[in-house]
Amino acid sequence: MFKRLFVANRGEVAARIVRACSELQIETVCGASTADLEANYPYLQQADAVVCIGGSAPSASYLQLEQIVQAAKQTQCSALHPGWGFLAENSLFAALCEQHGITFIGPDAATMDIMALKVPARAAAMAAGLPVVPGSDGILDSPQAAIVVANQVGYPVVLKADAGGGGRGIRRCNNDSEATQAFTDAAREAQSAFGNAALYLEKYIVGGRHIEVQVL
């Protein structure tokens, strides 16, 4: 069991990690942006320690691989939990943690390289003969490309961030006009949250149930 764990995220997921570690008697160190430090959220107060990992924007803090790993090392954390979104599915980040002797709570870098991005994961599923929701064959390079695929599979559709997680970079579209605006909005959000603006498209399943499977 780890003695001290670094929390490389914010908000609800960080609060859950801090709470779970407290129950397991594991010390937590939260990395926080300058804006979150100023807000002094309850989960930051509940953590054993808090360190600044950069500026207010996620790109200057929660997406800074080196800054986060160095903060974890300097606070003597032997493990790091990425939460969801941000760097949770970044294989370079997982590999960097390993290089510095920090246990990354999640899949190893090799597994992530296959499954971290949605489009390659979708391709791997199809190659294995698994059924997938109808949609684009790869990354969409423009709103016009999204509209072409949307009309092929039929509205409603959903635009998704290739590097998505935590519900970010996702937009439902019911017509061509919505798809045009949604493409810009989703790409901007994905770039801000993951440092990757790439999008793909799938048919939106109305009333569908989401079942997540983890293979350990």
Walk through the language-model features, giving the residues of each.
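N-terminal beta-alpha lobe that positions the nucleotide/phosphoryl donor
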Residues: 1-216
